[in-house]
């Protein structure tokens, strides 16, 4: 494959959709500049092939000057979809984020027609288009919107209709939709991971034309477990034979994959394309079917191109589980759309940075292609497997005691809205067609002059209607009192039938309708006698309407041989309390849905069994009653059935500590095994539950549920110490290098040096958690991180964002970071990466190899202070859901405007830097110390804090031979700080801060003493 990325950006730096016509001569593109670009595709492909063979300056100049041959301007917002009609060279559809859909025909002067919104609904709400597709016969256009609905547009009959009205579920955004190549199915993928499969067909109507009919046949909800919602687009694709559907951004057990659903295998997942770690948002099948050998139809395969937000393009062969070609970091920005030329030899894709890329394949590089006749035969083979529209699928069969199947629900074009007629005619025709669907044909030889209100949208709201005062009918009806009863009964019958319709209608003057000849089996209703029918060998008594029990029979003939009872149970006279909220509201709603919506069913099981999950935990830690009333009570980890730890001193990950818990007694002890790959090195058996484990530089340590610590040699498994008994279950077990740290559930803190086998410190974390409160025992902040450094210094972070270290010399906890610094310091890094400019890396989410384990937290490239400040950022964002901007806004509004608070931010910034420097001294962070110290001195020089500068310089200078005024305890002065020579730091400060005029007098004074400045006098 030869790959070319055009050097310049198009559409104001964002191309969101591209497509190619049938003869590969035109490429259309749309993006952020609200324009549609029309490209000469032949010239584009020829130029891309020329670059790969003759990369001359003339060719590169042609590339830089390459532009669309013309632009079409009709949209007023971002264009997110452009699609050519199948097999067409001139006509295509475009849509934008404002919900507009346009029809285009390419000529010298392109013709454009707005399909949606049309006049009769332009006053209603129009929602942004999410995705759009065109049927294989170029008759139907379907698009989804961000309110969870899918709409159909018939370009032949100019009708418009909502498809999702037959789903009867809470609207969920359908992120991608696609018609199949065989013109039988429409598939949609929602943000709730559910895939809806619609089947449709055409049937002749009374006007010798055909109308479509849709039906929801499958709901696939167990294909994948997660669905990333942060993707801008998700574009699914059908295989050219109509058998496979590729679903991107699927996730199963934290693994990103592309799922292939097979239509011939009853819509099951037959293949998952895995084998790489990057995300995939857009997929596109090659329009050709390939084989490994020429004209060999026994082993065929398709080719898929996939791309997404990770800037990676992959080419897949459906017969293989791994990609055949991967272009990593090929472009800058997300890959938003992919298209193939119709001959399958060129691949084009666009990015969010406005780049257009082309990949050209050599003949037979992807495989041997088949002729058009063979391709049609493949499609016909799939069409032979299509079930009729009235077919009952297995999940729709009767289960248990259900004797009668519910009716199949169809969406008929008879109920669609015409886009060419006026609003009143549209509603009138809609009402007439709706009445035909329920089997009622209202006839009259005269017209009724009834005045009603036009309803253009929304749901009909029931209201109390007073007894109608009917106007006299024209001709053919007598004016006696019996006719009044006849008219009243007719109106009631009409109202009851109208209420069964889903779309609002307007009662206009009905035109005279020719008499309809009913079937020989047509029976007229008698309102004075209940009707008895026989169905499936059982007598059915039709209920009689009370309001029409004494009315005269209607003259209106019925078109159905058996009149169905009026079923209108959506409104009830009783009200019920909602079920207990211990049951999910979504559960009992879905439990009441009709059987036709169930996606799974069984003829054998009357009651669905809950799927069994593997046992992850085998119990909880039992606390001693004496310690359960402690002032500090920390949570303890649950006891796991088994777990493994990979050795962090081994880069290959072949050494593993495997722990399998038994029954917690002598009859079945827990097993502790250290292995190299599958080979056992050493093992031990413990008659207790093992709770936690950690690894040091030369030891392994495990804890049991009763608070006992066992230590082993790293290599041989020899016991290093007798069992350490703490008496309380352990909440945190951490280690780094030669240090082992333990925090019990009652807040006791221990740190041991395992080389010399001595206790380094014993303290408690209660000062961090015991906050004063009048109400006594309250819930305090959670511990979010507990670790130990290479110097044996404990570190703790809390859920309020504060981070602490324990000073062994002072015997107290000291603050490293808190949210106050984020509140007003200029030097706070509020980014979420954990890496500030010029500093070491924290435990950011961008590096998958880093974890919050102590062993991997404090390596040479990482900064402890930046890590803890990153934890503060996480807690602030988690609690407030806002960034630093909101805090800064609070300062500017509430404090900076007040008298006496003008220097608030400068003061906070200086305090923040001073705290950083002091913590670096305690933690031994040499690299961070130099960076923070240099920044601090420059800042106090800039602000003119001469006293602070003098004190800093005096400390760095120390005692000198000529200075006899120093106090006698000056001999305690250390010449180095954090590995840096103090006087060298002083020289660096004098030279770097000399440009600040307010500090020059102080700097010159110390410069003379250290010999940097020569006194000419």
From Swiss-Prot:
Question: Where found, per UniProt?
Answer: Nucleus
- Which InterPro entries does this entry report, sorted A to Z? HIR1-like, HIRA-like_C, HIRA_B_motif, WD40/YVTN_repeat-like_dom_sf, WD40_repeat_CS, WD40_repeat_dom_sf, WD40_rpt
Q: Name one GO cellular component term.
A: HIR complex
Acidic residues compositional bias, start-end = 473-483
Q: Which UniProt keywords apply?
A: Chromatin regulator, Nucleus, Repeat, Repressor, Transcription, Transcription regulation, WD repeat
Which residue windows does the record flag with biased composition (Polar residues)?
A: 518-535, 545-561
Enumerate the residue ranges of region (Disordered): 417-561
Question: What SUPFAM superfamilies does the annotation carry?
Answer: WD40 repeat-like (SSF50978)
Presence of keyword Repeat:
yes
Where the WD repeats fall, as residue ranges, is 10-49, 74-117, 124-163, 167-208, 228-271, 275-326, 330-371
Q: Does the keyword Transmembrane helix apply?
A: no
One GO biological process term: DNA-templated transcription
Q: Which domain of life is it from?
A: Eukaryota
> What Pfam families does the entry give?
Hira, HIRA_B, WD40
UniProt-listed Gene3D superfamilies:
YVTN repeat-like/Quinoprotein amine dehydrogenase
Q: Which family does it belong to?
A: Belongs to the WD repeat HIR1 family.
PANTHER family from the entry? MEMBER OF THE HIR1 FAMILY OF WD-REPEAT PROTEINS, PROTEIN HIR2
**Any idea what job this protein has?**
Required for replication-independent chromatin assembly and for the periodic repression of histone gene transcription during the cell cycle.
Q: Please identify the protein, giving its name as recorded.
A: Protein HIR2
What's the source species for this entry? Candida albicans (strain SC5314 / ATCC MYA-2876) (Yeast)
